[in-house]
Amino acid sequence: MTVYNAPIQETWFVLRHVVRIGELAHLPGYEALDEDSVKAILDSVGKFAANVLQPLNHSGDAEGCSRSIDGNVTTPAGFKPAYDQWVEAGWPTLEADPEYGGMGLPKVMATAVAEYVLSANQSFETYTGLTSAAVSAKRKAALSRASRSRSRAASCC
């Protein structure tokens, strides 16, 4: 069986010495970030990727998803409990706005997390990646509509 070990020390090195994440706390979007939190997230997600996601890699490839005639979708064996753990840990909300229940962390943290998930189990990452993309698209569409509404209101008075 294949083993996955997340490159936690390497990721930490890049974030600390190349990105200089510790120096970014004064920037918008980085306020909630501190070195202890970064390390804890990398450690937790790395363990989850190695211990939960990587062992499911084969079922994701071999079984895939299936859709019944009545429209119900079945995911590969183990994916539902893994997804439940993923959500329970709060990782889908890393970069989401705290106003809507997110952690408000910068994209660089979500990218590091996605790298671990993708490396451990590409099939599983399609669920989490598509969800993040959908949330981002909805947010941008809502902001665009709000901006157009403000522009129209300002131009009519």
Task: Describe every region a protein language model picked out.
Residues 126-146:
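N-terminal glycine-rich flavin-associated loop
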